[in-house]
């Protein structure tokens, strides 16, 4: 049995942000760093019929793509990657072309299945960025165009321009969505439905906060390690009393119904959120070990949660929505 045992549910995409990741300041590894370790993950994915890998130029400083290339993963999986993001100028023609060239070389492929704009670059016009994306598509660099972390108005602007130029249109939007991050339901998702764009939900565990937020924040390891920029950024977004209270309430709810917290978080996104498998939506799942990946996929295949638990989970959003960061960057 596998996630494909629920054919009408959103698809599962495996996120490789931690592939090739360096140790944190306390010497803890986030994920696989050798071909042998990476192969263990891929074997689990094949066991569960998950065939889409998601990476990005900036993941682990480029080491994620490099490890996937060393694994020759594109021979067995659909490969999706993203242009460089987060920095001013990442959307210029030169930057986008350079990013794809680097990704192509690291992955060992000439074409990827899906190529994303990772983050908005508000110092560069969307027109220049889209001109370059279409140039890459015409050159046979990718099959499907995706976008991520854009505001709804930016999605509309980009789509309108691309359509006016008869360019490839974005057909996937990848954004954060979970029990504690539901801002996308108000404006973004309705727009995506209108434009025929699929939604892939990342961070279904809310960056792990749904799994004992207080302990994770106090430990200050991994993505919460405040010795680096990413950790400081994450703490600024989520290290708030409301999130700790919501996480504690979530643990209590899961205990009451006898379900694992991680499993409940994944299953809510896949079976009870506004994602629709019939429209091609998906959920991005990550893991810090092959064993954890196997456990997570096993939890997901259990299917929908009990109705009583789903009803209680709906109240979690009210605890954090006033403090919740925007769905876009």
Swiss-Prot record:
The active site is at residue 59. CDD domains: AKR_AKR7A1-5. Signal peptide: none annotated. NADP(+) binds at residues 54, 148-149, 174, 203-213, 288-296. Keywords: NADP, Oxidoreductase, Virulence. Substrate binds at residue 118. The keyword Metal-binding does not apply. It comes from the Eukaryota. Its EC number is 1.1.1.-. Pathway: Mycotoxin biosynthesis. The record marks 82 as: Lowers pKa of active site Tyr. It holds the Pfam family Aldo_ket_red. One of its GO terms (molecular function) is oxidoreductase activity. Belongs to the aldo/keto reductase family. Aldo/keto reductase 2 subfamily. PANTHER family: NAD(P)-LINKED OXIDOREDUCTASE SUPERFAMILY PROTEIN (PTHR43364:SF4), NADH-SPECIFIC METHYLGLYOXAL REDUCTASE-RELATED (PTHR43364). Oxidoreductase; part of the gene cluster that mediates the biosynthesis of sirodesmin PL, an epipolythiodioxopiperazine (ETP) characterized by a disulfide bridged cyclic dipeptide and that acts as a phytotoxin which is involved in the blackleg didease of canola. SirD catalyzes the O-prenylation of L-tyrosine (L-Tyr) in the presence of dimethylallyl diphosphate (DMAPP) to yield 4-O-dimethylallyl-L-Tyr, and therefore represents probably the first pathway-specific enzyme in the biosynthesis of sirodesmin PL. This is Oxidoreductase sirO. It comes from Leptosphaeria maculans. The gene is sirO.
